Amino acid sequence: MPKAVSLFSGCGGSDAGLVKAGFDVVMANDILPYAREVYLANQPETDYLIQDIRKVDKFPSAELLVGCYPCQGFSQGGARLADRSINFLYKEFARALTSIQPKAFIVENVSGMRNSTFKHLLEDQIKRFSNAGSIGYK
């Protein structure tokens, strides 16, 4: 069974799809205790770490890394402030990508990132993900 690591996992909606597709989610992460409760009610075998991603120092090996870092800074429904610290959590996803070196990764966010205010952040994400480790993701 292929392994997956999930970051910014929330209540596990996306991870439920991974499990249904045959993945073993070996680690999930978020900072919200209630999200962990819901997640583990549905996927009790997953190691769910409640911790700020910036403080996670080790990631398990996996064939797939998935994540949906917060979008409030980019979303039409949010404050849309380019300098909010949550707008830079993609760097933590890139750090995990470099550490794990999975065969593939999936990352999702809102279309507001293409807005001219945030375009430089989207371009930085693409650059960081493409250069993560020795694999050369495209």
Predicted regions and their residues:
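Conserved SAM/SAH-binding beta-strand->alpha-helix loop
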Residues: 32-33
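Class I S-adenosyl-L-methionine
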Residues: 55-64, 74-138
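Extreme N-terminal starter segment of soluble prokaryotic enzymes
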Residues: 1-4
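Conserved SAM-binding strand-loop segment of SAM-dependent methyltransferases
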Residues: 44-52
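Conserved SAM-binding loop
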Residues: 39
